[in-house]
Design a protein with these regions (language model features):
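Membrane-embedded beta-strand positions of outer-membrane beta-barrel proteins
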Residues: 30-34, 68-70, 97-101, 129, ...
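Surface-exposed loop and membrane-interface regions of Gram-negative outer-membrane beta-barrel proteins
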Residues: 38-54
Length: 259
């Protein structure tokens, strides 16, 4: 059922992907995204208007810096299902420990059947740890567990934060194979648009991209190291709320105003 891309020397896809996010109640959020293809050298879903991320999520804050979130719906990378996240954060925010478990099926628009949804769920689960070093603004992440298609692996990331910019390297070992690469997230113009009383319309806040050193062999044939996102705007900068980091830039901003 995977949309084959092995007969292409290179691939490209340009889409317009508007999304609506709506707060329903305390901690509850509805997200709906539709993908409009503009140009692509692929086929199947890449040539059709199709649903993007469509989810309903509930976040809960427990005592002692413990947070939980459950999300259900249609995710990125053609996965549909549910995911549960739990996270513990120290008072100063420099250490985070977490875990997640998800159960998803394959979901895609195909030429022969329209919207196809598989009947065999796949389970993915991870343990995570994150450490922030305030003097150099470096964030170190380590996670290990089971990916979507059954391979077990470990991934480590090192990310440097520059204001609203985030640039990092990663290394991945899964299914007996080594991979690595880099990633970045940069802010886009138009982030500070004025809010209407009821809603606001604005472009994406960030452009995020990840480069993988190895994208052939088992990483294609066996779909190793595959994961998904539960939000259309997930990146390593927009959800980075480290207290020391925020305090540092608030002080710098105040110093500029007083000069």
């Amino acid at each position: 059922r995977q949309m084959c891309i092995r007969d292409r020397l290179y691939t490209y896809a340009v889409n317009l992907s508007p999304a609506i996010e709506m707060g329903l109640w305390k901690g509850g959020k509805l997200t709906a995204q539709v993908v409009f293809p503009i140009a692509a050298n692929l086929y199947g879903e890449y040539k059709k208007i199709h649903p993007g991320v469509m989810t309903l999520s509930q976040e809960v804050r427990f005592r002692n810096n413990l947070f939980g979130r459950i999300t259900a719906g249609n995710f990125t990378h053609n996965r549909m299902g549910a995911q549960l996240d739990m996270k513990f954060r120290t008072d100063n925010g420099r250490l985070e420990l977490g875990a997640l478990v998800g159960a998803t099926v394959y979901s895609a628009i195909v030429d022969s059947e329209g919207w196809y949804v598989s009947t065999t769920p796949r389970v993915n689960a991870f343990l995570k740890a994150s450490v922030y070093e305030p003097h150099t603004n470096l964030q170190f992440d380590l996670q290990g567990g089971r990916y979507i298609y059954g391979d077990y692996g470990v991934r480590g990331d090192c990310t440097r934060h520059f204001g609203e910019y985030a640039i990092g390297l990663y290394a991945l070992y899964t299914g007996g194979e080594i991979n690595g690469g880099f990633h970045f997230a940069i802010p886009l113009p138009g982030k500070r648009w004025k809010r209407n009383h009821a809603f606001r319309i604005n472009p994406a806040d960030y452009f995020a991209w990840t480069y993988s050193m190895v994208s052939h062999g088992k990483y294609i044939n066996d779909q190793m190291g595959k994961s998904y996102n539960i939000r259309p705007d997930e990146n390593r900068s927009s959800n980075f709320y480290q207290p020391d980091y925020i305090r540092h830039f608030l002080i710098k901003d105040q110093e500029k105003k007083t000069k």
